Structures are given as structure tokens and as C-alpha cells.
Amino acid sequence: MDASAEQSLPEPGSQDSVAGEDIEIVVNVGGVRQVLYGDLLSQYPETRLAELINCLAGGYDTIFSLCDDYDPGKREFYFDRDPDAFKCVIEVYYFGEVHMKKGICPICFKNEMDFWKVDLKFLDDCCKSHLSEKREELEEIARRVQLILDDLGVDAAEGRWRRCQKCVWKFLEKPESSCPARVVAVLSFLLILVSSVVMCMGTIPELQVVDSEGNRVEHPTLENVETACIGWFTLEYLLRLFSSPNKLHFALSFMNIVDVLAILPFYVSLTLTHLGARMMELTNVQQAVQALRIMRIARIFKLARHSSGLQTLTYALKRSFKELGLLLMYLAVGIFVFSALGYTMEQSHPETLFKSIPQSFWWAIITMTTVGYGDIYPKTTLGKLNAAISFLCGVIAIALPIHPIINNFVRYYNKQRVLETAAKHELELMELNSSSAEGKPGGSRSDLDTLPPEPAAREGPSWGSRLKLSHSDTFIPLLTEEKHHRTRLQSCK
């Protein structure tokens, strides 16, 4: 910088360099010029804009540590930042809080707040929830990318036993990984259907046989088919347990508990039958066996493992507990009120079917849920009027929470598709940058397999700094710095 420009700066210790509350601070953020005043900025002295008040006394080093450029003639500070985000950030000086405008990326906005040194506590609660939701999405994308990278990478330091476990786990848990894995997944799906159909067919009297003691039991052919299915389910569960990287988490997960409930009744029934025969307590044992056989219906839930739609529906119902609780509360109040009214109004009829209020609960339930079996019905005019009102109230009560539940389902389904697309997009960009760094104009995904092993794990940078390590618009905060260098990504400035 020339001498004339240096001389145009206020001298340290001069009157001009002393910050006052009436000083004007002119900032140019992304081409948008803004005039701010010292008394306004001094409310939050720890922010970057407030530091501009006293920076002139520190010379060029201090000035350029705070801004990208400075015009001594105009006393104008230049910042190469997002002007839209800046307009939101300076609201803290006027209103004491910050609102993130629609259309601004939450993660970029957080970076802007960090740059201007405005604490996140000034961000409004509604905007914090949006930022938290976006952060969860990024963590999910990072988790998916990390899993795919782990599957693609081969660590030569791992033993043969560990590599074998990873291959078995990938074979059983990721049907899309290979053609044989798809075949096994389809076979498992078909066996679930076959075992469910066999369970139902075993209750048909024409397909049952009489044993030596005169009891009707399932046909031996159906029992053999069920035994074969149970053998497959058992082998599949044991292999997945054997290859699981975290066996405790595997055993306690919901879907694996369903798998255990699907195969456990078979072995418990078999054990109780043999023990009962020895102890001559066949009556009690048979009752226990029949009770356990009912648990076989749990195997139908195994279909959720092969159906993303069922998994989405389960998640939507879990997220709709509040709406479902309101529905049950409305129905419970309505059942109590209308059953009591129905019992009271029907007492004048000599052939009334409403013997008591608890017995009337059944009538209120089937009326409010629009089932109407017809086993209990009102016979008086007031009773019929009460039935009509209870019917209408039931329709309204059931319809109210349906829309939020559908919204939760659609939102989660769309979110899963977006996350899946974002993860694939990030991997494609990683591969593209890796191929470009190697001087290959068109590398293939198999190039990732030849990457050097990942360095020893160490504590990575903070969440905010990890965001800047990604080169694309899809930030993946959980990927470590070594992983990014491993794929030769360019830092996002």
C-alpha cells in the first residue's frame, strides 16, 4: 500500500482514532452499503461491528483482521459476505434478537453469525428449531456417506476374521450391494410370506389331522414347511448377530426383537411339549403351547425389514403420538358420556338392551367408530337421537388427527428421499474430485477402493469448522478432516 494511503489513516492516539458513541461506521457487505452508529453498535461490544469502532487506532493490521478491505478516504469497511444474512444479523442491534429470513440456508446463516461474532442465543426460538432440524439432516447424510465409504474401503490392517464379519454383515444388511445379496433378501421375504400363510392354513379344519389322543393338530406337511422356515430365520438371525459390529445394540433394536419373537415360540413350544410328556402334565403344557403359538403372528412384522414404506409408516405413527393421544382422549370422553346417556334414555323401554353403563361402553365404541354390529341398539326416540349424535362426534373425532398423521408420513418419506439423494450427490462429487486430483478425466466409483487406508482416528475439529471442509452445497459435518483429505476435497471458502 502506498504512502499516501497510509497517511490518510488516522494517526494512533489522535482525536479521530478515539471511538465515540456518535461515530459513524460505514460498511459495505457484498455491495450493499450500510451506515451504522457507535451508540448502536456499542450495545454489544463483543461483536465484530462493535470492534470496528476502535480498530482505526490499531493501524492496518487491526483493520484488515476485521474486514476484507478498507477505503481510507471514505472510511468504508468492505466485507465479502452475504448481504441478505447481514441484514438479518444487524437486527440484534435494533431489536435484541435475530430472525432468519426465508430462503437462507440455516447452516450458512450460522456461519455468518459466527463471523459477525453474534451469539446464537440471540437467534429466535423458531429459527433455532429450523437450524436444529437442518443439523440433524446433515448428521444423517454424514452417517450415510460414512457407511458407504466404510463399505467401499478395505482396511489392510484388519484381520481375516474381521473382514469376514464385514462381508457377511454387508451381504445380509445391504441387499443392494450385490446380486446374490438381492437374491437372499427376496428369498427371506418370500419365506416370511410362506410362514405366515402356513400359520393361517394350519387353522383350517379340513387341513388338520387327529393325533393319537384325539386332538386336532396341524397337518404334518404344514409343520415341516414351518420348521424349514424357522430354520432359515434362525440361521439368518445368528449370522447377523455374529457379523454385527455392535452386538448389544443389535440385540436391543426393535426389528431384531421382532425376529426373536418370530422364532422363539417354535423352540419354546418344542421344549415344553417334550418336558410335558415326561412330567405327564400335557393339559397345562398344551395350553402354554397354544398361547405361545399365537406369538407366531409377530413374524409378519419381519416384512418391515424389507419394506421402506412400512418403516416410514412406523416412524410417522411414532411421531404422531400426540395426535393419537388426543384421539384416544376424545374417544374415551365420548364413550363415557354417550354410554351413560344411552343407558339412562333406554331404561324406560321394557325390552332395553342397555343393562348397565359398563355394558353400554361396547355400544358407544362401535357407534363412535362407525362399525355398528347391531347386537346392541337403542329402541327409544331419545336413545336413537343420542346414537346419531354419538355417531357424528365419532366421525369428527377420528377425522381430526388424520391430517397431521398423513403430513408426518409425507414429510418423513420426502425427507428420506432427499437424504438419500444428497448422500449419493456427495459421494459422486467426492469421486469426481478424487479423479480430478489424480489427473483422470473420468474415474469410476471403484477408484475409491484403491484409496490409502484412513489415518488413525483423532479428535476432529468442532462442528462449525467441519462444515467448511465440504466442497459442495451439501455439508457433511460428521466426516472427519482425514476423510475429506483422503478423498482430496477442496475446502469451501
UniProtKB/Swiss-Prot annotation:
Motif (Selectivity filter): 370-375
Keyword annotations from UniProtKB, A to Z: Cell membrane, Ion channel, Ion transport, Membrane, Potassium, Potassium channel, Potassium transport, Transmembrane, Transmembrane helix, Transport, Voltage-gated channel
CDD domains: BTB_POZ_Kv5_KCNF1
Cytoplasmic side: 1-183, 245-249, 311-324, 407-493
Intramembrane portions: 358-378
Keyword Transport attributed: yes
Superkingdom, natural source: Eukaryota
Main location: membrane
Cellular compartments annotated: Cell membrane
Disulfide bonds, paired cysteine numbers: none
GO terms, biological process: non-motile cilium assembly; potassium ion transport; protein homooligomerization; regulation of potassium ion transport
Transmembrane portions of the chain: 184-204, 224-244, 250-270, 290-310, 325-345, 386-406
UniProt keyword Ion transport, yes or no: yes
Pfam families on file: BTB_2, Ion_trans
One Gene Ontology term of the molecular function aspect: potassium channel regulator activity
Purpose of the protein: Regulatory alpha-subunit of the voltage-gated potassium (Kv) channel which, when coassembled with KCNB1 or KCNB2, can modulate their expression and their gating kinetics by acting on deactivation upon repolarization and inactivation during maintained depolarization. Accelerates inactivation but has relatively little effect on deactivation. Coexpression with KCNB1 or KCNB2 markedly slows inactivation.
Subunit composition and interactions: Heterotetramer with KCNB1 or KCNB2.
Protein name (database record): Voltage-gated potassium channel regulatory subunit KCNF1
Source organism per UniProt: Mus musculus
Taxonomic lineage: Eukaryota, Metazoa, Chordata, Craniata, Vertebrata
